[in-house]
């Protein structure tokens, strides 16, 4: 089984920064209305001398009561299992985060929320269609819904991993909520906000019978456009 052990509250600077960043974004999620109390969870990929793995929020602890030392480190082991290191138990959804990190080297942060509109739409068990070009910002021409499975289960983690595939950064989780990922927490948080915004708009449109959709060819062009979005600004910053 998982091994838990007490760890000191002193961390290397890089790890301390990562722990503080997770708490900062957890509080941002709460302020934005995307999570309530201890619902949802966040993680950041983190490799240490002890091994490769990630830092994740603990289970059952409200974000405004969470301290950096409360976060749990999950280590990937050589035999394909996982080892949890910390004074608390990790989020019940740690499997979901682990499966995404191991399947997608491009993902360095994961945010899981129970935001209101995304959660309502997830209960319809259907994808958000390409009603707006920003659907492509999450990586596809639709925003899919992963099949239902019990929270915290391997089946849920597998379903989420398979639904995201090779390039999507987010999806709904049937009768549950949503998952957002990114190259860092800033991007994962932005994706979580975008999913909730799209869900809110689509929910309102469904009340009046929906709307015309953008075709696959145009969504493909939008996806290509997003690949270079912001690169010019980045070039100016580096120049």
Regions inferred by a protein language model and the residue ranges of each:
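Glycine-rich flexible loops
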Residues: 6-239
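Short, small-residue-biased leader/transition segments that mark boundaries at the very start
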Residues: 1-4
């Amino acid at each position: 089984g998982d091994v838990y052990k007490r760890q000191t509250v002193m961390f290397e600077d890089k790890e301390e920064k990562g722990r503080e960043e997770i708490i900062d974004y957890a509080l941002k999620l709460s302020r934005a209305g995307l999570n309530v109390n201890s619902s949802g969870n966040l993680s950041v990929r983190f490799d240490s001398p002890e091994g490769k793995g990630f830092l994740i929020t603990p289970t059952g602890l409200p974000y405004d009561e969470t301290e950096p030392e409360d976060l749990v480190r999950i280590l990937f082991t050589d035999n394909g299992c996982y080892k949890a290191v910390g004074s608390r138990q990790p989020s019940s959804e740690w499997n979901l985060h682990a499966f995404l990190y191991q399947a997608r080297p491009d993902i360095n942060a994961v945010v899981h929320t129970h935001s209101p509109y995304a959660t309502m739409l997830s209960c319809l068990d259907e994808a958000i269609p390409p009603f707006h070009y920003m659907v492509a910002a999450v990586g596809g021409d639709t925003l899919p819904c992963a099949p239902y499975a019990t929270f915290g289960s391997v089946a849920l983690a597998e379903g989420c991993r398979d639904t995201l595939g090779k390039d999507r950064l987010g999806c709904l989780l049937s009768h549950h909520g949503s998952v957002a990922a990114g190259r860092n927490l800033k991007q994962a948080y932005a994706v979580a906000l975008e999913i909730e915004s799209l869900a809110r708009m689509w929910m309102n449109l469904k009340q009046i019978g929906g709307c015309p959709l953008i075709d696959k060819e145009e969504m493909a062009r939008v996806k290509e456009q997003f690949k270079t979005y912001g690169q010019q600004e980045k070039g100016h910053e580096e120049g």
